[in-house]
């Protein structure tokens, strides 16, 4: 049995292309603040700041590639940081997808743009971070510090062929990954165990 923890935390920073185009200085500052300390899994926001936004509306293949690349970035990242001040279905989908696979999400928004719907979500992996032009860097650092404590740790162990067969069967029957089944099983036991103080 061993536990592996990545030494280089990877961050996926994403925002609405429409908003990046309206305030390149802000998004440049956000990208630079994050990338000085952490490995970025995508430089898309940085490319938008430097070269402008690509219009994908007329290109079905480019849309598909953009979608697949976004999912890869979510999966690869340890933490997802989003700027959600504007109304965007894409940002809502990305946020939902990241939380679905248990990634900590920092959802940043300008002080005057509180996201009413997302603010109603009750997910321990979601960090809502209100910021101003003055405190954006500090808000990023404080939010990342919180998010680091929410990152799942990879835990590997050996099982018998019989247990593996059962896990495969459960996965197919219930349509859930083996790791999710095991996590849920352990969490149920934790709730039952009155001596556990974690």
What residue ranges belong to the model's regions?
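Short Lys/Arg-rich basic patches
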Residues: 142-162, 168-171
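Conserved beta-strand-loop-alpha-helix hinge of the TIR/SEFIR fold
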Residues: 73-92
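Catalytic donor nucleotide-activated moiety binding site of glycosyltransferases and closely related
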Residues: 34-61
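Short, glycine/polar-rich helix-capping loops at beta-to-alpha or helix-loop-helix junctions
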Residues: 112-120
């Amino acid at each position: 049995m061993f536990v592996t923890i990545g030494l280089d935390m990877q961050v996926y920073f994403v925002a609405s292309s429409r908003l990046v185009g309206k305030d390149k200085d802000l998004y440049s500052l956000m990208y630079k603040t994050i990338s000085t300390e952490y490995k970025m899994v995508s430089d898309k926001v940085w490319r938008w700041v430097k070269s402008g936004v690509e219009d994908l509306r007329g290109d079905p293949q480019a849309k598909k590639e953009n979608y697949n690349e976004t999912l890869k970035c979510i999966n690869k990242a340890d933490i997802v940081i989003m700027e959600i001040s504007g109304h965007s279905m894409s940002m809502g989908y990305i946020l939902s997808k990241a939380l679905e696979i248990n990634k900590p999400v920092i959802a940043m928004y300008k002080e005057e743009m509180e996201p009413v719907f997302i603010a109603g979500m009750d997910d321990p992996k979601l960090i809502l971070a209100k910021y101003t032009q003055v405190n954006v860097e500090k808000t990023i650092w404080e939010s990342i510090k919180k998010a680091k404590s929410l990152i799942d740790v990879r835990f590997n162990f050996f099982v018998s062929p019989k247990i593996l067969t059962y896990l495969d069967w459960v996965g197919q029957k219930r349509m859930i990954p083996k790791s999710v089944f095991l996590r849920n099983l352990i969490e149920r036991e934790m709730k039952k165990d009155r001596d556990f103080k974690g």
